[in-house]
């Protein structure tokens, strides 16, 4: 065996000290000195308690909204081209019908619509004197996918603003979303914050329409009946009907920022700031509709409908509605994060209490301790001094695992603890293979250093093959699994790499150093 380079021993010492340094905050917890790293392993939902939610995204509503947008696009195009038509309306979720007049320039209208709305199917029905626009199948597939992906991003932004540490938000299937909120203190508020669509629309009030006839069911075709919540004299809230034009003249997609503030009566309100486009539109709208009422509609409910007194420049508006301070704060959060592209429906809800979480932690730690003690005893009784070396390698393996998970700021779950227990046995198994190989070399009459060298070399390929196949499985679990399964895969992957390092490199360096320094002529395994 060649002389062992000193850098190998230095590397082992450096890795050991570094692992201890980064693992201590996770192992000790509590208030630590400022010079200690602030990265720790976070406990998962099953360990510290919290909220588990499974949502279904109503993607058909996103298609319906796309159809509504198609109405606006077609209307604007025909207005720009100065084309005449009797009416335009949405039929179903994905179709728009334009009713023609005898004077309509049908050919020109078809040409314009086909050029500008290329993703939609444009058809002319002569007997009915109609042009029909239908969303294409490819576009509908894209809308569904975008609705789910955007919902995940918006939920993440809302939760981050709410202040939940280490949330887990994952897509399940084509239209479902799993949300896990460890350690959440107010589940109802969190559910309200996540599930609120937060669609903000500005619409003009139809003050010329007959409200009484609308209440009897005779609503004008261009209007809809909505309700405004106001504070009642005896406390609480009452709903007041309003006849509002269907057309949205400004939407919440132009909101750049939203903050909670207070009005002159010290009541919480939400102040919104529009982007450049929204600011210009808002200024134009308020300038053209002075002395008219502008309804501020949030998720289908009128929050307020003030009279426009003057043109409002500067791109700012306020939303009032008898909010509590908490409600105003949450509304500002959802407006900043943006509206959900489609409503969310809770399919499954589970609340894990902190007591159950504490029991899970205790059981998990007990399993690790019992497994560790049994492994240590077996190795010492069967391999004596070599067993002690293997046990030290296992301790270092666990320390490296904890430090790497802390650096990754990973979330530890019960399956993750199961992965750690599994790794204890796998780490020792590698050492057992090596020690048996060294025994065989010693029986052939080789010197201790030569036996160690050949033993590690011959065991290397077997250990590498076993760990690579397991690592491939862990990668597949991480790629296609969710939540706890991914936690198990992460723990297993990181632990396997640490196990290979300690079994193949660390024990070899330490063993060779001991034999060389003590000038041992024989080895007893």
From Swiss-Prot:
An example Gene Ontology CC term for this record: plasma membrane
Compartment list: Cell inner membrane
InterPro entries on file: Acrflvin-R, SecD, SecD/SecF_arch_bac, SecD_1st, SecD_SecF_C, SecD_SecF_C_bact, SecDF_P1_head
Highest taxon, organism lineage: Bacteria
Subunit (UniProt): Forms a complex with SecF. Part of the essential Sec protein translocation apparatus which comprises SecA, SecYEG and auxiliary proteins SecDF-YajC and YidC.
Function noted in UniProt: Part of the Sec protein translocase complex. Interacts with the SecYEG preprotein conducting channel. SecDF uses the proton motive force (PMF) to complete protein translocation after the ATP-dependent function of SecA.
This protein's name: Protein translocase subunit SecD
Species of origin: Magnetococcus marinus (strain ATCC BAA-1437 / JCM 17883 / MC-1)
Gene it is expressed from: secD
